[in-house]
Amino acid sequence: MADDDTTARRPVLSSFGTLGRGWLGVLALLLVIGLGAWAYQLQHGLIETGMRNVFSWGLYIMLFVLFVGLSAGGLILSSAPKFFHSQRYEGFARLGVLVSLGCIIVAGLLILPDIGRPDRIYQFVTSPDFRSPMVWDFGIVMLYGALNVWYLWLLTRRDLAARGSRLSLWVSDSAAGRDRDRTLMFWTAVCALPAAVALHSVTGWIFATQVGRGDWFSPLVAPVFIAKALVSGLGLLLVVSILADRFTAFTADRGELTSLGKLLGIFLAFHVVYLLAAERLPHAWAHHFGFWAITSNFLIGDTVYFWLWTGLGGAVPLLLLATPSLRRRTAVIFTASVLAVFGTLFEGIRLVFTGYQRVNINAAPGIATGGEYAGLTTDAWATAGTYTPTAVEIAVTVGVISIGALIVMAGLRYLPLQRAAPDAAYATDGGDRTQ
């Protein structure tokens, strides 16, 4: 047991080998390119992006939604067992919070290039308009990031103290201290679960409350966003866990991996099958009163993004995880998880396109795009929203994502993410409870 404890208190990545240093070099290069692209965008303005008046939310917001969901789902899955006094999936808790922290930092940073004038972001604090969902979302993102930092430190600080790390902030390792930490973990989970639900619900309501965007208005928007967070968050946690098990000293329990794969299948069924039907079927019935017309309207997607989400990112991983003989294989769990995250990405892309493709003034000349006017064509006006991300947007986005990847790499290198052995279950008063 002592050897197990000593091993658990070490980082799962003792040093960066050739592969690790190469990966760090790639991430650092992408970060530098991203910073350069952002500087170029700041100098020339948002005209360097593909966004215009008729399509004012682009790649930054699409991926903001994705990474908010990845973070919320990761923290929900890491904190829910502690809330219910369960030791199940304990081996994934620390890694899950680390991934959640990296994702929420990426999500928060993606706001900066989207607003065009990041030097004015302080006005969220100095002169907030509480009628705007954006103010609430900004506040929750900040609170959520701080909660992730606190929770990750709380989960690891005793092991950090046991090996004399300065990251423990001079906290000592003792039996009484660990008992107190168990109590704090419970109450942190009490705060983390509603915070995670609020984070992604408010993000969904930002879309639903936009004036003049009827395609986004739905009472199901918050449940859909929470389901999306559970699918993408668990999918990313499984991907990172399997990769960490393969390339570091982190050990992912095979039984719990299989169980989490089954749970991912349940989340996929609820999200892609039930909630999709609950949202689309009433609309189909309202427009078509024949059985085949209703069925075809429900099944036929609006765009290719619909099929990338529901087919490749929904039906395929669901079938893989619903087959008992397949979901026991780590490679199958990994593939299904990648596809689930991939599908969630295209669901977000489809969501933004759904709201912006149709404009409220569809008669000529339409809406001023806000772009350049050559004087020979009608490119200054548009009656339909179109969008293609520019190289500047892609470079900035990849640079921001590289920051999240670097945070996860740093956590693997410097934090004790492996649990040695199950502790006794804990009560809210800090005492032990036998299971």
Curated annotation (Swiss-Prot):
Function per UniProt:
Dimethyl sulfoxide (DMSO) reductase catalyzes the reduction of dimethyl sulfoxide (DMSO) to dimethyl sulfide (DMS) during anaerobic respiration; it can also use trimethylamine N-oxide (TMAO) as terminal electron acceptor. Subunit C is proposed to be a membrane anchoring subunit.
Q: Where are the transmembrane segments?
A: 22-42, 57-77, 95-115, 135-155, 186-206, 220-240, 257-277, 281-301, 304-324, 333-353, 392-412
User: Where the protein is mainly located, per its record?
Assistant: membrane
Subcellular location field:
Cell membrane
Q: Which organism is it from?
A: Halobacterium salinarum (strain ATCC 700922 / JCM 11081 / NRC-1)
Q: Which UniProt keywords apply?
A: Cell membrane, Membrane, Transmembrane, Transmembrane helix
Is this entry keyworded Iron-sulfur?
no
Q: How does it sit in the membrane?
A: Multi-pass membrane protein
Q: Please report the name of this protein according to its UniProt entry.
A: Putative dimethyl sulfoxide reductase membrane subunit C
Q: Does the keyword Chloroplast apply?
A: no
Q: Give the family per the record.
A: Belongs to the NrfD family.
Q: Name one GO cellular component term.
A: plasma membrane
Q: Which domain of life is it from?
A: Archaea
**What induces this one?**
By anaerobic conditions. Its expression is under the control of DmsR.
| Quaternary context | Probable multiprotein complex that likely consists of DmsA, DmsB and DmsC.
